[in-house]
From Swiss-Prot:
GO cellular component terms given for this protein: plasma membrane
Periplasmic-facing ranges: 29-134
Record's protein name: Cytochrome c-type biogenesis protein CcmE
Protein's membrane topology: Single-pass type II membrane protein
Pfam families: CcmE
Binding-site residues for heme, renumbered to this chain: H120, Y124
Organism: Ehrlichia ruminantium (strain Gardel)
Keywords assigned by UniProt, alphabetized: Cell inner membrane, Cell membrane, Cytochrome c-type biogenesis, Heme, Iron, Membrane, Metal-binding, Signal-anchor, Transmembrane, Transmembrane helix
NCBIfam families associated with the record: PRK13254.1-1
Spans within the Cytoplasmic topological domain: 1-7
Name of the coding gene: ccmE
Family statement drawn from the similarity comment of this UniProt entry: Belongs to the CcmE/CycJ family.
Subcellular localization, as worded in the UniProt entry: Cell inner membrane
C-alpha cells in the first residue's frame, strides 16, 4: 500500500505544479493579449502610466509637423486622438492618413514614441501588375 500512496502523492504534486504554472503564465500574458491599444482605450484606462505601451491608429491629415530633431503628429481611432512625438527615422509607408503602431510612453498628455511601425493593407499589388489592369 505504501507504493500506491507514494505514486498518488507524486501524481498530485506534479499536477499541482503544472496547474500552478499554467495559472502563472496566463496571468502574466493577460495584459499582453492585444498588440496595441487604440487612443480611446489608452485614454480611458490606467495604462497611461506604463512605460512601454503600443498604440495604433490613423495619422490625422494636416497634423504632421517636422522639426530638426523630431516629428509631431496626431493619431486617431475616429473617436479620440493622441499627440505623438517621435525622434528617429520614419518608415517608408508613413504618411498622413496611413495606419501606424507606435511604441512608447505617455508624458504630460503626449505620447513619446520610441518606435513607429507603419501598417499597410493586405491588398498589395506590385507596380508591374498595377499597370496591366490585373
Amino acid at each position: 500500500m505504501k507504493r500506491k500512496y507514494r505514486r498518488l502523492f507524486v501524481v498530485i504534486i506534479t499536477l499541482s505544479i503544472f496547474a500552478g504554472s499554467v495559472v502563472f503564465v496566463l496571468g502574466k500574458l493577460k495584459n499582453n493579449v492585444s498588440f496595441f491599444y487604440t487612443p480611446t482605450e489608452l485614454l480611458s484606462s490606467s495604462l497611461i502610466n506604463r512605460p512601454n505601451i503600443r498604440i495604433g491608429g490613423m495619422v490625422v491629415k494636416g497634423t504632421v509637423q517636422k522639426y530638426d530633431d523630431s516629428i509631431v503628429f496626431h493619431i486617431t481611432d475616429l473617436k479620440n486622438y493622441i499627440k505623438v512625438v517621435y525622434k528617429g527615422i520614419l518608415p517608408p509607408l508613413f504618411s498622413e492618413g496611413s495606419w501606424i503602431v507606435a511604441k512608447g510612453k505617455m508624458v504630460n498628455g503626449k505620447f513619446i514614441a520610441s518606435e513607429i511601425l507603419a501598417k499597410h493593407d493586405e491588398n498589395y499589388m506590385p507596380n508591374k501588375y498595377k499597370t496591366n489592369n490585373l
